[in-house]
From Swiss-Prot:
This is Protein BIG1. N-glycosylated. InterPro entries: Big1 (IPR037654). The gene is BIG1. It is found in: Endoplasmic reticulum membrane. Its main location: endoplasmic reticulum. The chain crosses the membrane at residues 276-296. The keyword ATP-binding does not apply. Keywords: Cell wall biogenesis/degradation, Endoplasmic reticulum, Glycoprotein, Membrane, Signal, Transmembrane, Transmembrane helix. Present with 3460 molecules/cell in log phase SD medium. Required for normal beta-1,6-glucan synthesis. One of its GO terms (cellular component) is endoplasmic reticulum membrane. Residues 20-275 are lumenal.
Amino acid sequence: MQTVLKYLLLIMCGSFCASEELQNQTNVPAIFFSYKLTPGILKYQEDYDRAVTLPRDTFIEAAEKFLGVCNADTYVFINQPGLRKLDFLEFETEFVSLQRYIRRSSTAIKFEKVDLLPQDLYYDLAEFVKEYCNVDQVLNLRGNNTEDFQPFIDSEKRVIIIEYPKLPEDTNERKEAFRHYDKYLRTILAQIPSPEQNVIYTSLNPGTTLAHESIIPIQIFPDIFDIKSRVGEVEQNNRVLDVPRLSFNDYTPRFSEPPSEYVSIFDSQLIENNRGLLQLIFTILVGYILIQFFFTKKTIVDEKITNKKDNVKQTSPQLLKKVQEIQKKPSQQVS
């Protein structure tokens, strides 16, 4: 259905372009998108009627609300002079990178018609961010020169203001310009270390447009923003996943450990489980002690008897000799 509607709008646009001259713009389109969820900003989209031009004060209020949450590491303000809402229909296929970044964002809103904005708006918003979001550095880049941007790897917050050249009026040249600027945007955003970026894309320098463009019911990337509106305020880039904690079974050792470091023989459970074995060990031990006792005693007695006999054998000749001497003494006295 969206595809058919696009073709019908292109046919209607072609008929107007062939028959009408261009006139100065009285309003400009605008897009906000942020990688992280920006709470409270979606109500500006819900309250917006694309048939009516959004007042400048309401736009600035929405921009400050969008930036004041301070949920980004880099704030990118893109000024595309001469941008008109018809470009998003006629050159939709050239906005490849822009659409991809909007699609992956958590918050995205768009306004097809906004009152003409001050040319110094981005500098005012940069001061607002510096004051409320603790940002020190502001980088100003020419949108047609990649050499202006020096890649950085630190974690300091920054404001980047991209000033594209004014779009040409020729259709083919305008198409080529959008393709080139889209690639430039991809080059810059891809080199920013953190994906947490808040981006505002609009025109601060109005150009020309069709006299009856306001009556053409053009929407900015309806395939993307219709989904964003239906989803509502949902964080789509939450790095910390909200998942239940993993549950693990209690640790159980493969083999049950003993109740203490040392096994005691007085453990009642040990005695009960090994009663027969303990009785056998005790009987053998007692028998061994008795055998050792009686065998040792018999050996001692035998040794004493042997020693006594040896002593008797050794002393008998001496006693005999002494007796003979005693007997000789009386006989000598008689003579």
